[in-house]
Amino acid sequence: MTTLSKKQRKMRNRILIAAALLVLVKLLPLTGWVRGLCCLAPYFIIGYDVLRKAALGIVNGQVFDENFLMALATVGAYATGEFDEAVFVMLFYQTGELFQDYAVGKSRTSIAALMDIRPDTANLETENGLETVDPEDVAVGSVIVVKPGERVPLDGTVLEGSSTLDTAALTGEALPRSIRVGDDIISGCVNLTGLLRVTVTKPCEESTVSKILELVENSSEKKAVSEQFITRFAKYYTPCVVYAALALFLIPTVLLAVLPTLPGFLAGTVWTDWLHRALTFLVISCPCALVISVPLSFFGGIGGASKCGILVKGGNYLEALAKADTVVFDKTGTLTKGTFAVSAIHPEAGFEADQVLEYAALAEQYSTHPIAVSLREACKSGMDRSRVSNVEEIAGHGIMAEVDGKRVGVGNSRLMERQSVNWLPCELPGTIVHVTIDGFYAGHIVIADQPKPDAKEAIVQLKAMGVKKTVMLTGDTKEVAHTVADALGLDEYHAELLPADKVTRVEELLKQETGKLAFVGDGINDAPVLTRADIGIAMGGLGSDAAIEAADIVLMDDQPTKIAVAIRIARKTVRIVRENIVFALTVKAIVLVMGALGRAPMWLAVFADVGVAFLAILNAMRCLYTEKDKK
């Protein structure tokens, strides 16, 4: 332990001094109350704070806490002449508490380090030059300067400069993102290369990093079912065990006093034996292993997920996600890129594919329509605007233009009919762009939304994890939906749906399934469905306020494979929680029985309390470590 706090170092020194004094007393030939008086020094050195807290607890009516139980057990041991054991039990207890405090502190420090993404200062441009100010003091519309190596303090738009950004703290991905003038920039990223002047678009309290931190910090308020169970369990468990300990002492003691012939279980015992057993019972009764480790497991799971760019709004959602056996996807922007791209070119005889694409792209040179943008991006030849003239946009039809002196038409079937040109239909899914050159049909170009590179792998991973059903909902045509679903290996698809229809479909699926249903959407247009599903997952939440507000879980980037990562983290967290519950209850049950039978020494009872808690906390800390840490 090289990073102990001042309080922890003080406790360590008390433990060492008390242990040394106890060893000294053990070595001296002391007996009776002389030995008892000598043991008082190490006992009070190591246990004075426990005794003080126990007394305050009694005054305040907090009888059933661990300080009261430990004080009662050790004072009782002292009163029956078990001086060495009283000191040893308190020493063992405080040592366990030190390790426990260290483990909890380390885990919380690790989680805090994960979320240490909010800069403390911003470089504000003023009439007097650059001033270093608190981000909260920067008004919307102000210009800030972000130097290479600095973390972006506020959301804004790049006014001047270009650079690359490290978004790993937000998305979990190490690949830098390029940025230039006009691009949006969000707080929490690290500027890697160039100096940037940024116009602030949001106040500090509404910035992306503030919303993320608020979300993670508030996640502990939404407790999982397991956490709620432990809270209720502890409320009744401790008093029941205390009363059982009291009965374990009083009943045999009374029977010893009044029965002329003792039954077998009382034979050979005296009242102090039963007092010792009752005190052992008391030590075991504290449920701190569960009360501390279960919430810590969920908090660690949420912190570990945030390292991967997955924000979970509470332990209840993490626990629900672990039970998900149906995943429903929106299509556009979730499984597909949500942007048009040329997927096929079908030239007519006498024309080349590159020629058809080039003429179409040149004709669409001045258009801002998404289809025009996709044509220009697909054309590898230079876009020389001097080759284009007499551009005429025909609403609802397309564009007519002169390219290299040739009359070119680019548009839909209505444009072909307007020109009295015979055109060929296409059965491929997507938007069909027909092209004519000097009145002759040159061919058609298919423009379609493309599946994301990892979309198919995401479905494969989900099925490998035991997800029973993957479903796609879309407002697109049945042909397009069938093509995407078939390419990705989805189990079902439902097409041509309005937003209200999607809610209806999800409700139908909820009635069919026994497990939990997760819906994955873009978080902007899918708010009703995100709310209706057992778990609403918004994808692409980086910079999207609507996504962060609408969903239970937010994926900060656009990778569908993150869904499988989120489920793995959820299942691991719930598995660790169950391990801790089973381990703690099993050990306590065994030692309780041993204590009642007089087979458990007091130090074993302390282990069943503090030792089990320490081991459970160490196990809970595993929730912090994810697949990303193994790379």
Language-model features and meaning:
Residues I15-A20, F229-G264, F281-F298, R578-F607:
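Bilayer-spanning, highly hydrophobic alpha-helical transmembrane segments
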Residues Y43, Q94, Y236, A267-A289, ...:
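Small-residue-enriched core segments of transmembrane alpha-helices in multipass membrane transport
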Residues T2-S5, K26-L27, G32-W33, C39-E125, ...:
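Actuator/coupling domain of P-type ATPases
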Residues M1-K6, V23-G32, D49, K53-V59, ...:
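Membrane-embedded alpha-helical bundles of multi-pass transporters
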Residues V59, L69-A71, K106, D120, ...:
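Conserved catalytic phosphorylation-site environment of P-type ATPases
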Residues A113-L114, G141, L215, G315-I535, ...:
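Cytosolic catalytic headpiece
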Residues A54, E82, A103, A122, ...:
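Residue-level signature of catalytic and energy-coupling elements of molecular machines
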Residues A122, V133, L154-D155, G161, ...:
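Conserved cytosolic headpiece of P-type ATPases
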